[in-house]
């Protein structure tokens, strides 16, 4: 059974799952799909193109699937996809995509805290925690189990690898490879492995050692990046974690530069 407040405005074409709750003065446009048992608070605006999964929680003042903030956008049909069990807190804004990819994607089991903005064509993975007032430019890619500290600004097209942690108030204008900590405003730098986060997620001492060995070569050997990656490829066991690190450095799309070592 759905519970929809009398003051909510629901488009005639909107598809609402079983057990959906919608608070007062919320506006849901026509081309919207909302999964079962999702709870939407008061004064929320969900625009055409939103595809929201099951058991999400969307708080007061959130604005989802509005048009991308991109001068090239010409009104083409695009989407915002949100997975299951994602929590979206107060006044979050998530724009839909542009013709570049057609959609902005937010995965499942995420916590997106108040006043976060994610621009057009962003891809945010699963089990991600984004603290208050983080701002993502368009085309950012955020891997699974990433944590981003409050008030960080993430430049358009930046990639953040899985299990990485970005410190609060950072100016993240460089790609952040998996498993590391990064931070800084005037100088955004590598700050070591995300050891506590990795241990909490069940990484073994052997896995941590393999990751540490790879990043010692990449960030502390003094080698050019291309030579450091070659050394990692040739001199270390090619475990899944090491391969993931190498793949990240090999797969940049927008030619963003990579994170620098803390002593550079």
From Swiss-Prot:
Keywords: Acyltransferase, Cytoplasm, Lipid A biosynthesis, Lipid biosynthesis, Lipid metabolism, Repeat, Transferase. It holds the Pfam family Hexapep. InterPro entries: Acetyltransf_C, Acetyltransf_C_sf, Hexapep, Lipid_A_LpxA, Trimer_LpxA-like_sf. GO terms for biological process: lipid A biosynthetic process. It is found in: Cytoplasm. Gene3D superfamilies: Hexapeptide repeat proteins, Udp N-acetylglucosamine O-acyltransferase, C-terminal domain. One of its GO terms (molecular function) is acyl-[acyl-carrier-protein]-UDP-N-acetylglucosamine O-acyltransferase activity. This is Acyl-[acyl-carrier-protein]--UDP-N-acetylglucosamine O-acyltransferase.
